[in-house]
Amino acid sequence: MTEWETATPAVAETPDIKLFGKWSTDDVQINDISLQDYIAVKEKYAKYLPHSAGRYAANGFRKAQCPIVERLTNSMMMHGRNNGKKLMTVRIVKHAFEIIHLLTGENPLQVLVNAIINSGPREDSTRIGRAGTVRRQAVDVSPLRRVNQAIWLLCTGAREAAFRNIKTIAECLADELINARKGSSNSYAIKKKDELERVAKSNR
């Protein structure tokens, strides 16, 4: 037998994909069992950059498979003047994650996941009625909408905090995520969530 036949095949190891080359997804825990299918953060969804150019709006529920950091990045591209500037928002998120790591010493992905879990309202009120009589009725919120609303509230809070402020939007996003992770009332998202749940409770 020649040495070619006896040689053991080299096993190509898959490289460990880290977000921005720094943050690993392996140790990220999703403590809320109802949101585990809707927060895409596991190895399967790992990306070097939060930009996959996927067609997530093609089907309902497809966006649940969009990596959660990419959903945050896309949500930061709001208000006309920032529409389509994804490179700018990727840079903002990267900077915010570095600030979070400096302030907390934790994996920023874990901080983001915890902030989303804490910021999603569990109960909301909807309008029910016909022929002129409208009343509000408390309803449970689906897991996907909880994630959608949490991301929207976190981004809105960061955007409003940075407006006419000396702090950069990356610093405001980092503060918002850290406060939401703690459940602090300094967070815009937590305040809004509590308000929505309070209104829903009064409409039960």
Swiss-Prot record:
What is one Pfam family matched by this protein?
A: Ribosomal_S7
Share an example GO biological-process annotation for this protein.
ribosomal small subunit biogenesis
| InterPro entries documented for this protein | Ribosomal_uS7 (IPR000235), Ribosomal_uS7_CS (IPR020606), Ribosomal_uS7_dom (IPR023798), Ribosomal_uS7_dom_sf (IPR036823), Ribosomal_uS7_euk/arc (IPR005716)
Glycyl lysine isopeptide (Lys-Gly) (interchain with G-Cter in SUMO2) crosslink site(s): 47
Mind telling me which Gene3D superfamilies this protein's record contains? Ribosomal protein S7 domain
Q: Which residues carry this modification: N-acetylmethionine?
A: 1
* Positions bearing Phosphothreonine: 14
Instruction: Give the CC-aspect GO terms.
Output: cytosolic ribosome; cytosolic small ribosomal subunit; nucleolus; ribonucleoprotein complex; ribosome; small-subunit processome; synapse
Q: Which CDD domains match?
A: uS7_Eukaryote
Give disulfide pairs as residue numbers. Answer: none
Q: Which residues carry this modification: N-acetylthreonine?
A: 2
As stated in the Swiss-Prot or TrEMBL entry, residues carrying the post-translational modification Phosphoserine are: 142
Supply one GO molecular-function term: structural constituent of ribosome
Q: Which residues carry this modification: N6-acetyllysine?
A: 47
**Localization of this protein:** Cytoplasm; Nucleus, Nucleolus
Q: Which family does it belong to?
A: Belongs to the universal ribosomal protein uS7 family.
Role played: Component of the small ribosomal subunit. The ribosome is a large ribonucleoprotein complex responsible for the synthesis of proteins in the cell. Part of the small subunit (SSU) processome, first precursor of the small eukaryotic ribosomal subunit. During the assembly of the SSU processome in the nucleolus, many ribosome biogenesis factors, an RNA chaperone and ribosomal proteins associate with the nascent pre-rRNA and work in concert to generate RNA folding, modifications, rearrangements and cleavage as well as targeted degradation of pre-ribosomal RNA by the RNA exosome.
Q: How does it assemble?
A: Component of the small ribosomal subunit. Part of the small subunit (SSU) processome, composed of more than 70 proteins and the RNA chaperone small nucleolar RNA (snoRNA) U3.
Q: What is this protein called?
A: Small ribosomal subunit protein uS7
Upper lineage: Eukaryota, Metazoa, Chordata, Craniata, Vertebrata
Whichever gene encodes this chain, its name is Rps5
